[in-house]
Amino acid sequence: MSESHVKISRTIIRGTSPSTVRLESRVRELEDLLDLERDARVRAERNANEMSIQLDTMAERLDELSGTSSQTHDAIRRKDMEISKLRKDLENANAAFETAEATLRRKHNTMISEISSEVENLQKQKGRAEKDKSQLMLEIDNVLGQLDGALKAKASAESKLEGLDSQLTRLKALTDDLQRQMADANSAKSRLAAENFELVRVNQEYEAQVVTFSKTKAALESQLDDLKRAMDEDARNRLSLQTQLSSLQMDYDNLQARYEEEAEAAGNLRNQVAKFNADMAALKTRLERELMAKTEEFEELKRKLTVRITELEDMAEHERTRANNLEKTKVKLTLEIKDLQAENEALAAENGELTHRAKQAENLANELQRRIDEMTVEINTLNSANSALEADNMRLKGQVGDLTDRIANLDRENRQLGDQLKETKSALRDANRRLTDLEALRSQLEAERDNLASALHDAEEALKEMEAKYVASQNALNHLKSEMEQRLREKDEELENLRKSTTRTIEELTTTISEMEVRFKSDMSRLKKKYEATISELEVQLDVANKANVNLNRENKTLAQRVQELQAALEDERRAREAAESNLQVSERKRIALASEVEEIRSQLELSDRARKNAESELNDANGRISELTLSVNTLTNDKRRLEGDIGVMQGDLDEAVNARKAAEDRADRLNAEVLRLADELRQEQENYKRAETLRKQLEIEIREITVKLEEAEAFATREGRRMVQKLQNRVRELEAELDGEIRRAKEAFANARKYERQFKELQTQSEDDKRMILELQDLLDKTQIKMKAYKRQLEEQEEVSQLTMSKYRKAQQQIEEAEHRADMAERTITIKRTIGGPGSRAVSVVREINSVSRGNRATSIM
């Protein structure tokens, strides 16, 4: 259910399919039946010709018998004239005749009782045979129905086997695809593991960079606070200069206040520097040294203020103009500081987004690792399932080879059984013909027995008439005694002549009777030999049939075991196919999920690229603004150096801010390098994914093309199979029509044969009537002791022959009943085994056909 690879291929059955093979085998069987019917018709025509020849011979014999009957009538007329002369002989023969008559009556009565009992037994056996025949016909109908069911089951099993072969090829293709997918998945797994390791390292670097960003952010915020305080100090310095223009004392007081404010600012700076992390320790120490230098400079300024008061008075007017300029620059710087604060807030928001994205990337990496582990487990399970499927595939290939060998052996055995069936059918036909001959002979013997009985009855009536005539004649003799005594002397010579003539006629009759006895004995011996030969042949045929029945039972058992093994193999294959389909569905779902995940990762990478580009643009803008600020700060520091030493302190602060900015720029450069490296890696990953997508699409296109080709091939195979099936069905119909015609002609031949048989029986009855008339005449003539002894001897011989034939008949009937009993037992065991083991094979149908044919023939022979 049947012939059936790491290449996506599929075997297509071309030529004759199993259904066409079955139809061709059916056609061959019908042709064999047609040949058998033709042979039977030829034999029937031959039998009809033989019967016509026998009819002609019987007609000739009837003509001869009619001629002999006319001669016997003439002889009877002569004998009637001589009866009166034989009365004295009759008186002497009466005593012996009466004793023989009594013995014959007793024997006749016993024979009639035995024959009647045998007839009743035969009628009972006939009734039983008819019942058995009806039961056998019902059983044959049931067996034929079961045979049709078995053939349908066999056809369905073969179609299932073909479907399983196609599924096996599909599973092989799927296993090849799964192996390739497993190799791709293994390579993707290794690549993803390396990429995961790289992403983990990059994530760690991102986290370190985030920490450094947070630290630089805190440093920048502290620097911005310092700048704010420096601007406030500049404003206070300007106010102090204005007050110094009014009064040196006020300037001194202001300078003292500035000193105190600078001391407070230095304390605040120390507190802020103390908040820096371990990475900014050098910066803290440098700031502390600079603050100490500032304090020393402020002390030197305090000492030099008295010296420079005069110079400041000269420069006051000039400084007013400079103050106005500084006011303008202050406004600009405040605006720029506000912009920087807004940019700082935007950078902080972007930093938060980057940290959130880093966390998402970390979660995604964990999820990918988990999915990679799941895929490794699934790949291992698929590998084990693939190995199991390959083992099942090899096992199924071996089973398919064994099945092909077994099918070839079964075909050979079916051919042998078909030949044996033909031989047994021909032997059964010969046996039926011989049985019909035996039945005809039996009917002939029964007719002869009836003739003898009627002749005996006629003889008894003739004896009674003769007794009456004897009494009358005795009275007449007493009356005519005197006259006869006178005439006796005259008639002595005539009596002697008559005695001589009667002796001659009696001798002729005895010779004819002896010839008839010899002919009868030869016929009986010939029939006896013929019956013995037929019985021996029937015994040999029964032995052959029993041996064939035993062999067929053995083959039935082996076939039932084979069918069970095939069913188990089909069930295992079905379970393996379902498991492979479920695994394929699971792998398909996982592939779809991985594709969706890759799409999500791609979208996230695109978002991260856009965010990186935005951050780079914003960083460039910030760098430009910082460069502008450095220029403005440099100008301010130059002005401050020319103004006062405290402006130099502010310039030092600005230098520190510039150094921090440079460090931030270095960090930004490193981040840009990391971002570029990540972009390259993402680009490579995208290229790998694109290559995988193109490969997958190519494989899908190839699979679609292969499926289209397979569908076209299947459609072509189905069209060709349907065409062949229709052709074979038409051929089967033609053969069935020819078979019906042959059957009809055979029926006509059988009808003609029956008609000839009826005509032959009518002629036989006529000849028997003639024989009976002849026997009556002979019985009337043959009144002597010699004739009675001849009858007695014939009756005894016929009794012996009938007893022998009846004993042989009973023995043959007993053997037939035993054979039928054995056949019934074998059929019951076969039906039991068939109900236990499922649908049988063709050998079982052959055995049942043999049994049904043999039983039908036996039933017809018994009838």
Swiss-Prot record:
Any one Pfam family here would be: Myosin_tail_1
Superkingdom, natural source: Eukaryota
Q: Which UniProt keywords apply?
A: Coiled coil, Cytoplasm, Motor protein, Muscle protein, Myosin, Secreted, Thick filament
Annotated Gene Ontology cellular component terms:
extracellular region; myofibril; myosin complex; myosin filament
Name the coiled-coil region(s): 19-836
Q: Where is this region: Nonhelical region?
A: 1-18, 837-863
Q: Where in the cell is it found?
A: Cytoplasm, Myofibril; Secreted
InterPro entries cross-referenced by the UniProt entry: Myosin_tail (IPR002928), XRCC4-like_C (IPR014751)
Q: How does it assemble?
A: Homodimer or monomer in secreted form.
Annotated family: Belongs to the paramyosin family.
Role this protein plays: Paramyosin is a major structural component of many thick filaments isolated from invertebrate muscles. It is a prominent antigen in human cysticercosis, may have a role as a modulator of the host immune response. It is able to bind collagen and has complement inhibitor activity.
Q: What is the name of the protein in this document?
A: Paramyosin
Gene from which this protein is expressed: PMY
